[in-house]
Amino acid sequence: MIAKEFETFLLGQEETFLTPAEHLAVLIDTHNADHATLLLSQMTYTRVPVVTDEKQFVGTIGLRDIMAYQMEHDLSQEIMADTDIVHMTRTDVAVVSPDFTITEVLHKLVDESFLPVVDASGIFQGIITRKSILKAVNALLHDFSKEFEIRCK
């Protein structure tokens, strides 16, 4: 369990580690593979969130998913180019709710580079990246004593 003071400090950094949906490049589940490939090849992220037109979270997709789907189904480039990405989207993705705990985020980010934040209605709210959490932990290590007093028991 994380000490209450540490969790309070880290949650105070939430603005720095929660990237809202409106500031992200996302794909719509009906986009075709050509569109997704173009977007993914121009980004630094290896995966991006996939949502419906109504902002319902579907999953995530990366170039590897697109290539694997094409090879698995032996599809030509022409057919693949027009195929909706919903068929190749990874749906078994770890997510957190907007009322996440730091413990939950830290445990899930061990295996994922980012966590989608999805509300109870399934609406995509944004992401928390491993990099942003590491920056918050760095701030904790450098700035904690400016706000809190550290004493030995």
Regions found by a protein language model. Give the residues of each.
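Tandem CBS (Cystathionine beta-synthase) repeat/Bateman regulatory domains
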Residues: M1-K153
